[in-house]
Regions:
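Active-site cores that bind ATP or allylic diphosphates and position pyrophosphate for catalysis
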Residues: 133, 144-305, 312-317, 376-379
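Non-catalytic terminal extensions that flank enzyme cores
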Residues: 2, 7-47, 72, 177-183, ...
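Residues that form generic nucleotide/phosphate-binding pockets
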Residues: 95, 120, 149, 164, ...
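Disulfide-bonded cysteines in secreted/extracellular proteins and peptides
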Residues: 3, 139-141, 165
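Alpha-helical structural motif
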Residues: 88, 117, 245, 261-264, ...
Length: 379
């Protein structure tokens, strides 16, 4: 009885807070059938002016959808709107228009969609793990707490949450501690409990159109992920799945740093399908086609960052770069070289699409060199 009362109280408190591959790629293996409309998306985070790496990803996404007779949507991933620079979204939109990368419909803004994310969260709360607990639980750990007890994986800086607060639910003492902290209004995030490492549900596999067969154990490789931050901001991992499925996106092109996230997002999509969330909105979850790109680094081999104004598109435009020069350079970084030339060639977005479509195997030039690319003569 104690546990039942505590669980009910925990759910009510959370709801109230929320209110406020194969080596041989064939064309038909990685492209949609003619009866399926490819819908891609530009999904930039307007945390600053886009850099050239962002433009490479935007162009690649546009090429993928357009080459399949589809179209693009534009979604501004501004969940943490308080930290977004003023006019950053407008500048992103202007840069895309300037480059000739078009989309259909009006842009959508994630900060305006918190109600639908809350609904998705509540759907996940209704699901239980193997121990009969809700898949959503409160986490009182700070980032420094987690860094102190967990090591980054694979040298990419990713830190797997060790499950400290999840383990509190395993004992009566831990449950009492959770209840006390909630009663004291202790700040906490909400996490999504992944299956145990030895559970078949923890293994997620998919074919990436560029990097090939991928397989992740979402327990060992990712761990329990934050679904809503302590300040009430919903996580990227939840919002992106909700928005992609509800808007019909089925063609996702982005950087390889999100390969790991693809597995988690597939699992979240399947959970929301199981919960009935998507059916309630007249859609069903279907796995999208993924293509993850090598990253773009600067001359020192460091990843480009908006915060460092790395190869800022605005600065390049002010320096006299034309849209054709930008598109040509992005195609060069993707490995698509016009007429065998080994230097970037200016071209329009339409020219880039024709060049992309001239290759027999989609993404063949990208797969020929999966190493991250550097742009030394632009730094």
């Amino acid at each position: 009885m104690f546990c039942e009362l505590m669980l009910c109280k925990l759910v009510l408190i959370k709801k109230n807070i929320g209110k406020d591959f194969k080596k041989d790629f064939k064309k038909d293996e990685i492209m949609f059938s003619k009866s399926t409309i490819a819908i891609g998306r530009f999904a930039p985070t307007p945390s600053g002016r886009m850099h050239i790496g962002n433009m490479v990803a935007m162009l690649a996404a546009w090429l993928s959808a357009k080459s399949q007779g589809g179209h693009m949507l534009l979604r501004l991933e501004d969940l943490d709107i308080a930290r977004m620079p003023k006019d950053a979204s407008a500048r992103v939109i202007d840069d895309l228009k300037w480059a000739g990368l078009d989309w259909v419909g009006e842009p959508t803004y994630q900060h305006e969609r918190t109600e639908i994310y809350q609904e998705a969260l509540e759907s996940l709360e209704s699901l239980q793990d193997d121990d009969g607990n809700s898949l959503i639980y409160p986490c009182f750990c700070s980032r420094s707490d987690i860094r102190a007890i967990a090591a980054p994986q694979e040298g990419d800086g990713f830190i797997r949450y060790p499950g400290t607060c999840r383990n509190l639910r395993k004992t009566s003492e831990g449950l009492a501690q959770i209840e006390m902290r909630l009663q004291n209004n202790q700040q906490h995030s909400l996490r999504l409990a992944v299956p145990s490492a030895d559970s078949p549900q923890a293994n997620v596999s998919f074919i990436d159109a560029i990097f090939g067969a991928q397989s992740f154990n979402i327990n060992r490789d990712l761990g329990d992920m934050v679904i809503r931050r302590a300040d009430g901001v919903f996580s990227y991992q939840l919002a992106v799945v909700v928005d992609d499925v509800l808007s019909g996106v089925n063609d996702i092109v982005r950087g390889r740093d999100l390969l790991r996230s693809a597995a988690l997002q597939i699992w979240i999509g399947e959970l929301l399908e199981k919960s009935g969330f998507f059916a309630a909105h007249g859609v069903h979850y279907v796995r999208p086609q993924f293509a993850h790109l090598p990253l773009i680094d600067n001359a020192q081999g460091d990843r480009l960052a908006k915060s460092k104004h790395s190869l800022d598109v605005g600065a390049l435009r002010e320096a006299g770069w034309s849209a054709e020069r930008m598109i040509g350079y992005c195609m060069y970084l993707l490995g698509y070289k016009k007429h065998g030339q080994n230097q970037p060639v200016d071209m329009s977005a339409a020219d880039a699409l024709a060049l992309f479509e001239s290759f027999d195997t989609p993404w063949g030039s990208v797969r020929a060199n999966l190493a991250d690319k550097s742009v030394p003569f632009l730094d």
